[in-house]
Amino acid sequence: MNHTTQTQLFDFFERFKAHWQTQKKSLPQAIFEPQWISPCQIGEVENQLIFWSPIKREPALDMSNIEQALDIKLHPSIVDFFCSAYSAGLPAVYQDHPIELIQAWNDEDFNLLQENMLAHFMMQKRLKQPASMFIASCSDEMQIVSVLNATGEVQLETLGKGQEAILAENLADFLATLTPVIIE
């Protein structure tokens, strides 16, 4: 387990919650969807909103099913990023560019995430591109932030075209540079 990635992820969770506390004097809030319950939810629904907070998964999950299906070994930072916690998506800014970190809200969301991962890897294989895994969406819907599976480097990727730029040497360093934001 890459404790550095996990440490930086949980540090970002704390910075995200602190930003909400400073700006809104509360925990983060999400629209309550009764069919989409999460262990992150806290308290009662008010005005169709529910408070929430990222929580550590105990025990952490793994992605051995994806590794077996694709016959690859996932970079440990990818596994730590997606398997360590439940959380809603986390809006942030990277060097003046808005992004949203992808996380799993509940077990069903984690299963959907894994299906999307399989499709992403298969598309890359078909296009003869290096394997990478998305970790964040960008304001340009054709771009994602992803982790190169072979090296752990974080890159800006254009879907169907490949790498645009290396953003960080590793996921922990990338997470440390992010500034949390609140999307109204």
Curated annotation (Swiss-Prot):
The keyword ATP-binding does not apply. GO terms for cellular component: cytoplasmic side of plasma membrane. Its main location: membrane. It is a peripheral membrane protein. Keywords: Cell inner membrane, Cell membrane, Membrane. It is found in: Cell inner membrane. CDD domains: Syd. Interacts with the SecY protein in vivo. May bind preferentially to an uncomplexed state of SecY, thus functioning either as a chelating agent for excess SecY in the cell or as a regulatory factor that negatively controls the translocase function. Belongs to the Syd family. This is Protein Syd. The lineage of its organism: Bacteria, Pseudomonadati, Pseudomonadota, Gammaproteobacteria, Alteromonadales.
